Amino acid sequence: MTVKTTLNAKDVDNAYLRIKDVVKETPLQFDLYLSQKYDCNVYLKREDLQWVRSFKLRGAYNAISVLTSEAKEKGITCASAGNHAQGVAYTAKALNLKAVIFMPVTTPLQKVNQVKFFGSKNVKIILTGDTFDDCLKEALIYTEQNHMTFIDPFNNVDTIAGQGTLAKEILNQSSNDSITFDYLFAAIGGGGLISGISTYMNQYSPQTKIIGVEPSGASSMYESVVVQNKIVTLDHIDKFVDGASVARVGDITYDIAKKFVDDYIQVDEGAVCSTILDMYSKQAIVAEPAGALSVSALEQYKEKIKGKTVVCVVSGGNNDINRMKEIEERSLLYEEMKHYFILNFPQRPGALKEFVNDVLGPQDDITKFEYLKKTSQNTGTVIIGIQLKNHDDLNQLKINVHDFDPSNIYINENKMLYSLLI
């Protein structure tokens, strides 16, 4: 069988006809807060409100629905630790197909349970491998041995066409109010979303500049398209933005992105965390890290988008509540508002009071203090966390800490030590 490797806008239109009665048409919302913040018109495409709280359902449903009757009868497989697995599970139940979903053993129980919920009795989950790559190998072996069909999360034309239906919806919704977009921002992981969107927008809204956004710790598309001019596999990726942390983009998505994506932005993971918290507190939007990427990118484009009309794809909202402490910590670290030190503390009455009076500013707050008194020693080791009210107070804080203990260790600059705290 010949595998199709090219995509055009007609493929997206056909995909839309297949999925429109199953996939939710998510809102395209004007965002007053972001519009005022950046002095432009910002719209959000709310894929976090999709049935599975992510755009991945679009591609999964389209890719599975075009399979032959024989392939559907034999069943489908996928490997995923997140949103793609939920999209495949939802589709398997909707089409009454057998699906075997492989997930790493390290997958949070919440995500495993969500896949079970969406797939119900149609889905079998196999937890295997410590990493996604190990899990993928097992899935491919199982697929071949059982003559099933593997549903690729991004490097498949039918998957990409399904993701592209999001762009068709944006244009349909905006045309009602005669809105045209100058910029569209969307996250890049493996490249399926940006490829589908850019293909469709190039045909029907060529004036719209397509901006791909990646986490700075996993910018595989930027490295491939812009830096190396060939597909590369990153040696190491930061997996915090798990929905967009891919070491190697797809062959198909690489070719499409190279043709149609106008620019690439890399966003620090700490900035993503600040955006997640901002979206929740200011707009009551629960975005996962990958879902917040597009909005995070606006800060780097703030001069270019002034007076323009912009749309950001909020690609997903599957955020594990157990991660919120880490998200807050990463945000405070990025904003330079929270700082950790290891100090030698005098073991005598009144030492802590002296520290508070001599080191802390009037608005500084101690958020962590770990200390075990040892009567046989003159000093004891203390781990202390200090949160600032004003980021400009940092230099004075460091001076005061140094005066108190010249041998202090500033933990924020030591990734290994800092990782023990969160």
UniProtKB/Swiss-Prot annotation:
Pathway: Amino-acid biosynthesis; L-isoleucine biosynthesis; 2-oxobutanoate from L-threonine: step 1/1. CDD domains: Thr-dehyd. Residues 339-413 form the ACT-like domain. It comes from the Bacteria. The modification N6-(pyridoxal phosphate)lysine is found at residue 56. It catalyses: L-threonine = 2-oxobutanoate + NH4(+). Pfam families: PALP, Thr_dehydrat_C. Belongs to the serine/threonine dehydratase family. Catalyzes the anaerobic formation of alpha-ketobutyrate and ammonia from threonine in a two-step reaction. The first step involved a dehydration of threonine and a production of enamine intermediates (aminocrotonate), which tautomerizes to its imine form (iminobutyrate). Both intermediates are unstable and short-lived. The second step is the nonenzymatic hydrolysis of the enamine/imine intermediates to form 2-ketobutyrate and free ammonia. In the low water environment of the cell, the second step is accelerated by RidA. This is L-threonine dehydratase biosynthetic IlvA.
